[in-house]
Amino acid sequence: MSRYRGPRVKKIKRLGSLPGLTTKKPPIVVRDPRKLSRPKPKKKSQYRIRLEEKQKLRFHYGLTERQLLKYVRIAGKAKGPTGQVLLQLLEMRLDNTLFRLGMASTIPQARQLVNHRHILVNGRIVDIPSYRCKPRDLISGREKEKSKALIQNYLDSTAKRPIPLPKHLLLFHSDDPRDLLKGSVKKIIDRKEVGLKKIKELLVIEYYSRQISP
């Protein structure tokens, strides 16, 4: 299954807030109180509940089905709780790290920056959005004016809707426009700092349980 490129508001109406996918909000529908109330929604099956949690992860981080399954399998073989390791793997991706630093308004924007070779990691161009960031990695835009302008524009737009910087990241501010825009990774992210606040990662693991069992 390919990466989702359809209407983003449609997804957040069904799944709730997905800040990595879009900054938009679904329109508020004002209903006529004189009309009969709608019937109560049917109770969701356990399968659907797990499916929706999986879809939240997939759309928030902008992954294909195959990519997410691969991360679940890697997490299952790692030390520590599988769900927590899965979230750490997703959060430490380069595209998500740029998004959490405020260098992009959404993860798709961050992915474009990486794909178009605007981003340096430890002084070298990295054009792979799935690059796994590590503690002490230094992330910056290239010295090209186009790269600087793009990232500064994203930083300005994210400043209008301030989002707390997670504790595992550090953003260097400078008043000199000639300076490179830089951020660094201080440590592996803690579970409580994950960007998708209401995710129930254990349900995602349960959804994939048959596909990852030996």
From Swiss-Prot:
<dbReference type="GO" id="GO:0015935">
    <property type="term" value="C:small ribosomal subunit"/>
</dbReference>
<dbReference type="InterPro" id="IPR002942">
    <property type="entry name" value="S4_RNA-bd"/>
</dbReference>
<comment type="function">
    <text>With S5 and S12 plays an important role in translational accuracy.</text>
</comment>
<dbReference type="Pfam" id="PF00163">
    <property type="entry name" value="Ribosomal_S4"/>
</dbReference>
<dbReference type="Pfam" id="PF01479">
    <property type="entry name" value="S4"/>
</dbReference>
<protein>
    <recommendedName>
        <fullName>Small ribosomal subunit protein uS4c</fullName>
    </recommendedName>
</protein>
<dbReference type="InterPro" id="IPR005709">
    <property type="entry name" value="Ribosomal_uS4_bac-type"/>
</dbReference>
<comment type="function">
    <text>One of the primary rRNA binding proteins, it binds directly to 16S rRNA where it nucleates assembly of the body of the 30S subunit.</text>
</comment>
<feature type="region of interest" description="Disordered">
    <location>
        <begin position="1"/>
        <end position="46"/>
    </location>
</feature>
<dbReference type="GO" id="GO:0003735">
    <property type="term" value="F:structural constituent of ribosome"/>
</dbReference>
<dbReference type="GO" id="GO:0006412">
    <property type="term" value="P:translation"/>
</dbReference>
<dbReference type="InterPro" id="IPR018079">
    <property type="entry name" value="Ribosomal_uS4_CS"/>
</dbReference>
<feature type="compositionally biased region" description="Basic residues">
    <location>
        <begin position="1"/>
        <end position="14"/>
    </location>
</feature>
<feature type="compositionally biased region" description="Basic residues">
    <location>
        <begin position="36"/>
        <end position="46"/>
    </location>
</feature>
<dbReference type="GO" id="GO:0042274">
    <property type="term" value="P:ribosomal small subunit biogenesis"/>
</dbReference>
<keyword id="KW-0689">Ribosomal protein</keyword>
<keyword id="KW-0934">Plastid</keyword>
<dbReference type="InterPro" id="IPR022801">
    <property type="entry name" value="Ribosomal_uS4"/>
</dbReference>
<keyword id="KW-0687">Ribonucleoprotein</keyword>
<keyword id="KW-0150">Chloroplast</keyword>
<comment type="subunit">
    <text>Part of the 30S ribosomal subunit. Contacts protein S5. The interaction surface between S4 and S5 is involved in control of translational fidelity.</text>
</comment>
<dbReference type="InterPro" id="IPR001912">
    <property type="entry name" value="Ribosomal_uS4_N"/>
</dbReference>
<keyword id="KW-0694">RNA-binding</keyword>
<feature type="domain" description="S4 RNA-binding">
    <location>
        <begin position="92"/>
        <end position="153"/>
    </location>
</feature>
<keyword id="KW-0699">rRNA-binding</keyword>
<comment type="similarity">
    <text>Belongs to the universal ribosomal protein uS4 family.</text>
</comment>
<dbReference type="GO" id="GO:0009507">
    <property type="term" value="C:chloroplast"/>
</dbReference>
<dbReference type="GO" id="GO:0019843">
    <property type="term" value="F:rRNA binding"/>
</dbReference>
<dbReference type="InterPro" id="IPR036986">
    <property type="entry name" value="S4_RNA-bd_sf"/>
</dbReference>
